[in-house]
């Protein structure tokens, strides 16, 4: 089992462990530096350990804010993914988990933000207490520094009469910190799966608060409220001796009044590179959005599915890739991902869009396909296209055996792959590595995806004519059927074609037994590397991951299942 787990999970584990290790190192190193550094001795007198907690979490925040934009820079990831020299094997598959890493980094930002905020609330209160009338000793002496000429202050709170909330809102750091916190709350809460499923538009718009987040982050340290002793002051002012003789600071030559300065802001240095990279990403998207997209065909399918055929200058794709589509007449800002359902051999590229939210429903209305004939092509809404981008499905042809599994509308990514196989068979081209494809499709009603059943029928016919029927083995499972359908199916069971799908391969009714399926595939292909590709529900994804681990051989010479899930 450990070997089987390593096949599919080791890469993700190593990445997560490395990320955690860097965070731990930065936090611990910074924490102890601020705990022991002599320049911050007097600062610690006022703030105590909260100083180290605030600064350590700040460094980790800077590190994670540096990383957060990289996983969503699609063109950068596609560039790296296409560089086989830099990205091979299991590490290439990690690029397909970019959104998982994006979420992991976001959790890191959230955790460190909470630590940072709580620590600074303690700091603010302790600064405030330092100006209290009953404050005494070294604490009072340090808090009063800055009142006399030629003195620099250590305590940014200059009076006890003003409340801590007012003090917070009177500083650059306080205002920007509040803005950063609110932006983070909006972004995190709107990123829950429930919000993304029920109102993708809310998720999309609130995520663009990141612009305000990074601007506030860049100037957050400009207030320099955390101050330490200057190097010149440390040279003249012996902290070890002078801390016990604070009453003599004004008179004793050995203990001149300590001078303090704020630390130079550094957050912008951490974020500058990724922000510039992401700015280039958005410029590329803007440029692509203004390239002309010609809609050549519109087809309305059952169950509110819209098929669009398009052309665009210099558009080159590979099987399994996806694009982002914008329709300015529906929303001038929103971009939505859709997998390509056309093959590279075709002179157009296509997508199938199902109405499953406000934006897609509005798009279908814009094309007037709800119960009406498609619009004339000249009156079609303008579309902008960004992409294509590579996903995990692009690796189907890199395995000798590939198992493709889809549920419901998740079948669309496999249309391009199967079409590509179909064209290669038509052109008598060989598939260098791929020798067998197992395709599983689980849906409630095949009629809802009539277009895909037609594709399978064409593929089945062509491959049979070419004598390559052995290359593809497909299994359709229908989960939505009633008693009347069952009787109808039973009466026509002996017919050569399936009564529901019209295919030679009979459909199954219910759900597949994955233990039996994986056991049979492992038996059919001993000593093979088998790629398992899935697009569908999270629950089934967990089941398939478990099957890949369970049926991968411990023996390096045995069968190995490599799990890949399509993510947007």
UniProtKB/Swiss-Prot annotation:
Specifically expressed in inner ear by the spiral glanglion neurons, the vestibular system and the sensory epithelial cell layer of the saccule. Weakly expressed in skull and brain. The chain crosses the membrane at residues 13-33, 50-70, 104-124, 168-188, 202-222, 396-416. Its EC number is 1.6.3.-. The keyword Ligase does not apply. The keyword Oxidoreductase applies. SUPFAM superfamilies: Ferredoxin reductase-like, C-terminal NADP-linked domain (SSF52343), Riboflavin synthase domain-like (SSF63380). Residues 285-395 form the FAD-binding FR-type domain. NADPH oxidase that catalyzes the generation of superoxide from molecular oxygen utilizing NADPH as an electron donor, upon formation of a complex with CYBA/p22phox. Plays a role in the biogenesis of otoconia/otolith, which are crystalline structures of the inner ear involved in the perception of gravity. PANTHER family: NADPH OXIDASE, NADPH OXIDASE 3. Its cofactor is heme. Activated by the ototoxic drug cisplatin. Activated by NOXO1. Cooperatively activated by NCF1 and NCF2 or NOXA1 in a phorbol 12-myristate 13-acetate (PMA)-dependent manner. Inhibited by diphenyleneiodonium chloride. This is NADPH oxidase 3. N-glycosylated in a CYBA/p22phox-dependent manner. The lineage of its organism: Eukaryota, Metazoa, Chordata, Craniata, Vertebrata. Residues 34-49, 125-167, 223-395 are extracellular. GO terms for biological process: detection of gravity; otolith development; response to gravity; superoxide anion generation; temperature homeostasis. It catalyses: NADPH + 2 O2 = 2 superoxide + NADP(+) + H(+). It is found in: Cell membrane. One of its GO terms (molecular function) is superoxide-generating NADPH oxidase activity. Disruption phenotype: Mice display balance defects, a tilted position of the head and abnormal performances in motor coordination tests. This is associated with the absence of otoconia in both the utricle and saccule of the inner ear.
């Amino acid at each position: 089992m450990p070997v089987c787990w390593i096949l599919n999970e080791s890469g993700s584990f190593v990445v997560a462990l490395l990320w955690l290790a860097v965070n731990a190192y930065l936090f611990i190193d910074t924490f102890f530096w601020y705990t022991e550094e002599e320049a911050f001795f007097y600062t610690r007198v006022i703030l105590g350990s909260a100083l180290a907690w605030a600064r350590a979490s700040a460094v980790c925040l800077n590190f994670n804010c540096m990383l957060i934009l990289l996983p969503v820079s699609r063109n950068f990831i596609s560039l790296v993914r296409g560089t086989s020299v830099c990205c091979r094997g299991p590490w290439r598959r990690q690029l397909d988990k970019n959104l998982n890493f994006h979420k992991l980094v976001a959790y890191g930002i959230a955790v460190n933000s909470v630590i940072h905020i709580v620590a600074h609330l303690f700091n603010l209160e302790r600064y405030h207490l330092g100006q209290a009338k009953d404050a005494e000793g070294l604490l009072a002496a340090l808090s009063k520094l800055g009142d006399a000429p030629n003195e620099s202050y250590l305590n940014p709170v200059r009076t006890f009469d003003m409340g801590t909330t007012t003090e917070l809102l009177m500083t650059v750091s306080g205002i920007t910190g509040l803005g950063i916190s609110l932006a983070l709350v909006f972004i995190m809460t709107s990123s829950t799966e429930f919000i993304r499923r029920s109102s993708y538009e809310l998720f999309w718009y609130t995520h663009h608060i990141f612009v305000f987040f990074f601007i506030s982050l860049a100037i957050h340290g400009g207030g320099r409220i955390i101050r330490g002793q200057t190097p010149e002051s440390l040279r003249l002012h012996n902290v070890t001796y002078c801390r016990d003789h604070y009453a003599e600071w004004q008179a004793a030559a050995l203990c001149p009044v300590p001078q303090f300065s704020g630390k130079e802001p550094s957050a912008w240095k951490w974020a500058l590179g990724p922000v510039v990279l992401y700015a280039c990403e958005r410029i590329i998207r803007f440029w692509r959005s203004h390239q002309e997209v010609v809609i050549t065909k519109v087809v309305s399918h059952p169950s509110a599915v819209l098929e669009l055929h398009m052309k665009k200058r210099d558009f080159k794709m590979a099987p399994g890739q996806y694009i982002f589509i914008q329709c300015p007449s529906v929303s001038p800002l929103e971009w939505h991902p859709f997998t390509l359902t056309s093959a590279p051999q075709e002179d157009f590229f296509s997508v199938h869009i199902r109405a499953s939210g406000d934006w897609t429903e509005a798009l279908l209305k814009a094309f007037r396909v709800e119960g009406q004939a498609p619009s004339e092509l000249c009156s079609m809404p303008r579309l902008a296209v960004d992409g294509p981008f590579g996903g995990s499905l692009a690796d189907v042809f890199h395995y000798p055996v590939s198992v493709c599994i889809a549920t419901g509308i998740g079948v669309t990514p496999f249309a391009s792959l199967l079409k590509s196989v179909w064209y290669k068979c038509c052109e008598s081209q060989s598939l260098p590595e791929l020798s067998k494809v197992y395709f599983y499709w689980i849906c409630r009603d095949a009629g809802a995806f009539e277009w895909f059943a037609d594709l399978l029928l064409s593929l089945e016919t062509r491959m049979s004519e070419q004598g390559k029927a052995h290359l593809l083995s497909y299994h359709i499972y229908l989960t939505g059927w009633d008693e009347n359908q069952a009787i109808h199916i039973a009466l026509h069971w002996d017919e050569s074609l399936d009564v529901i799908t019209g295919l030679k391969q009979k459909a199954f009714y219910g759900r597949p037994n994955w233990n039996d399926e994986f056991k049979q595939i492992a038996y059919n292909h001993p000593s093979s590397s088998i790629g398992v590709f899935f697009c569908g529900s999270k629950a089934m994804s967990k089941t398939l991951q478990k099957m890949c681990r369970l049926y991968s051989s411990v023996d390096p010479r045995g069968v190995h299942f490599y799990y890949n899930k399509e993510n947007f």
